[in-house]
Curated annotation (Swiss-Prot):
The gene is Znf830. Signal peptide: none annotated. A zinc finger (C2H2-type) spans 53-75. It is found in: Nucleus; Chromosome; Nucleus speckle. Residues 129-143 have a biased composition (Low complexity). InterPro entries: Matrin/U1-like-C_Znf_C2H2 (IPR003604), ZNF830-like (IPR040050), Znf_C2H2_sf (IPR036236), Znf_C2H2_type (IPR013087). Residues 16-40, 303-331 form a coiled coil. This is Zinc finger protein 830. One of its GO terms (cellular component) is chromosome. Residues 81-213 are annotated as: Disordered. The keyword Zinc applies. Widely expressed at low level. Expressed in oocytes from primordial to antral follicles. Also detected in somatic cells of the ovary, namely, in granulosa cells from the pre-antral follicle stage onward. Component of the XAB2 complex, a multimeric protein complex composed of XAB2, PRPF19, AQR, ZNF830, ISY1, and PPIE; this complex binds preferentially to RNA. Interacts with XAB2. Identified in a pentameric intron-binding (IB) complex composed of AQR, XAB2, ISY1, ZNF830 and PPIE that is incorporated into the spliceosome as a preassembled complex. The IB complex does not contain PRPF19.
Length: 363
């Protein structure tokens, strides 16, 4: 019987047509495209749809083996190396930010000190106009330079912002009080300058009015303290920083050398016990195998001995049978000989009983 898609040969083998082969190939391609693709940053497919690991540069035969490859030793080592390289690159970048803020803070302080010295030079004779100008400058100062370090603080980490938030609030609360005190100190100076004449023989010039610093400098000092605290933590200290190993371990918040040695000794003893148990189990297994081999050898020897005994018994039976046959034959021969002897004696007696003359005549 023949069909449209396939035929059968006289031998019974099935011959597939070209159309059916094409249909099967299309189904296979559709199944291969519909299979689940691996969604991973390290998974990579080539033009033929073959899966490979971009991190290890190794091909994976199928999607079912991807999880096995991810849990493998080589892939985990590559991932750990990648994480370590990322941590090493992020470390120096975060460490450079506090140094830049320190430099900016010191530059701001030096500039303020220069301004204070410059303002202290011409104010040898205090006046109402100078004091009022200083007060106006002091009131306007917090609003202008306070913007100098704000972008730097936007780039800091969230933890530093939370830690310095309370101190910033306290400093902002104290600023109005300081301005009020300075205003109250400046008002008596104005009254005294109006009442008393200028003394040309006064060798001690009046001190320059206190100009309140802006909040940016206080913020820089707070940030500098936070950076110094972070640099002075136990994580920044290298191993062996202190001569005393116990103090060094206590500061770095690790186990003391003695405790570490005890811990290592306990681990060593535990490992030795495990090795001893394994070796004892191996020796016991070998002894058991040797005992079984000896028993098998003894059993084989016993079987061989039983075979030899059976052979000897069979040979003994054969010899006994042969001996019996020989004895019976001998007895028969004796009986025949006795019969022959008796016949000879009877004939001899017959001859002797006859007359000799008759005997001679017969001859």
């Amino acid at each position: 019987m023949a069909s449209s898609t396939s035929t059968r040969t006289p031998a019974g083998k099935r011959v597939v047509n070209q159309e059916e082969l094409r249909r099967l190939m299309r189904e296979k391609q559709r199944l291969s495209t519909n299979r689940k693709r691996i969604e991973s940053p390290f998974a990579k497919y080539n033009r033929l749809g073959q899966l490979s690991c971009a991190l290890c540069n190794t091909p994976v035969k199928s999607e079912l083996l991807w999880q096995t490859h991810v849990l493998g030793k080589q892939h985990r080592e590559r991932v750990a190396e990648l994480k370590g390289a990322k941590g090493a690159t992020q470390g120096p970048s975060t460490g450079t930010v506090p140094q830049a803020t320190k430099r900016r803070a010191t530059d701001v302080e030096s500039q303020d000190a220069k301004k204070a010295k410059a303002s202290a030079g011409p104010q040898v004779q205090p006046s109402t106009s100078a004091s009022s100008a200083n007060l106006d400058a002091a009131r306007a100062a917090p609003s202008k330079p306070g913007l100098g370090l704000l972008p730097d603080y936007d780039d800091e980490e969230e933890e530093e912002e939370e830690g310095g938030g309370e101190e910033r609030r306290d400093s902002s609360k104290h600023l109005p009080d300081a301005q009020g005190k300075e205003h109250s100190l400046a008002s008596p100076r104005e009254t005294t300058s109006n009442v008393l004449p200028n003394d040309p023989f006064n060798t001690n010039p009046p001190k320059a009015p206190l100009v309140p610093h802006s909040g940016s400098i206080e913020k820089a000092e707070i940030h500098e303290k936070v950076v110094e605290r972070r640099e002075n933590t136990a994580e920044a200290l290298p191993e062996g920083f202190f001569d005393d190993p116990e103090v060094d371990a206590k500061v770095r918040k690790v186990d003391a050398p003695k405790d570490q040695m005890d811990k290592e000794w306990d681990e060593f003893q535990k490992a030795m016990r495990q090795v001893n148990t394994i070796s004892e189990a191996i020796v016991a297994e070998e002894d058991e195998e040797g005992r079984l081999d000896r028993q098998i050898g003894e059993i084989d020897e016993q079987i061989e001995c039983y075979r030899r005994v059976e052979k000897l018994r069979n040979r003994q039976d054969e010899i006994k049978n042969k001996l019996k046959e020989v004895l019976t034959i001998k007895e028969l021969q004796k009986k025949e000989e006795e019969n022959v002897d008796s016949d000879d004696e009877g004939e001899l007696q017959d001859l002797l009983s006859q007359d000799w003359r008759v005997k001679g005549a017969l001859l």
